[in-house]
Amino acid sequence: MARLGAFDMDGTLLMPDHQLGEATQMALHRLHQRGVTLAFATGRHLLEMRQMLQKIALEAFLITGNGTRIHAPSGELLFAEDLSPQVAEAVLHGYWDTSASLHVFNDSGWLTDNDDPALLDAHAWSGFRYQLTDLKRLPAHQVTKICFVADHDALCELRVKLCQTLGSQAHICFSALDCLEVLPPGCNKGAALQALSQHLGITMADCMAFGDAMNDREMLSLAGKGLIMGNAMPQLLAELPHLPVIGHCSRQAVAHYLTHWLDHPHLDYSPE
């Protein structure tokens, strides 16, 4: 019996239009009523996730910034990790010869010098917005993470350069095909879920986790029950071939799985 459920947002709980479907909301409420502790593990900002939780009236722990922050439902900060100022400085002021736009996250919000309203489509449900900022003048301390947004091929080239420059000073991963993130070393959703489970006195064997992207890899591999979305990144499927694959986020596959698990816990699950 799972005691802790960890859920990625984009490509997992959220549908392609970045909305949280009614079936998914109902399934999450049922899971909570059954006594399972909920945790949303996402690259999204704490401020945005709090707005989302208010909309669905659900109590949950928040793992935000891809594991750089953990908050209790009460709002208490349980864990925080930032990029070192040296790494933030190197990324912000380095010349990377890339077409990718640059986005910086700290506790105040989402900062960028790229005014592209299309980026807000993914945040329409919450109303979360970026703040236009001269990133070259931004202090390098207290930076949670830095993201690059571009097509996947351009980001693959950039990833090689970042890894060569930063080495073990940062954790670099794809949170989507078009988003490459620079995080503090050792920071990922899996490490954050381990820290949260220890805080709650729950073993990782009693955790189930759902995800679709490479920033979910550690969380899915460490959870007692890791479930991969049918729309997952090919790299994730290749790296975790032993984990079960459920349906597509467009069909609210997490809700489908949870409903089966709640109603028929002893029967094998089929995505169809």
UniProtKB/Swiss-Prot annotation:
The keyword Glycoprotein does not apply. Its cofactor is Mg(2+). Pfam families: Hydrolase_3 (PF08282). Signal peptide: none annotated. SUPFAM superfamilies: HAD-like. Keywords: Hydrolase, Magnesium, Metal-binding. GO terms for molecular function: 4-amino-5-hydroxymethyl-2-methylpyrimidine diphosphatase activity; magnesium ion binding; phosphatase activity. It catalyses: 4-amino-2-methyl-5-(diphosphooxymethyl)pyrimidine + H2O = 4-amino-2-methyl-5-(phosphooxymethyl)pyrimidine + phosphate + H(+). The keyword tRNA processing does not apply. It is an enzyme of class 3 (hydrolase). Mg(2+) binds at D8, D10, D212. Gene3D superfamilies: 3.30.1240.10, HAD superfamily/HAD-like (3.40.50.1000). The active site is at D8. CDD domains: HAD_Pase. Its EC number is 3.6.1.-. NCBIfam families: Cof-subfamily, HAD-SF-IIB, PRK15126.1. Belongs to the HAD-like hydrolase superfamily. Cof family. Catalyzes the hydrolysis of 4-amino-2-methyl-5-hydroxymethylpyrimidine pyrophosphate (HMP-PP) to 4-amino-2-methyl-5-hydroxymethylpyrimidine phosphate (HMP-P). This is HMP-PP phosphatase. It comes from Cronobacter sakazakii (strain ATCC BAA-894) (Enterobacter sakazakii).
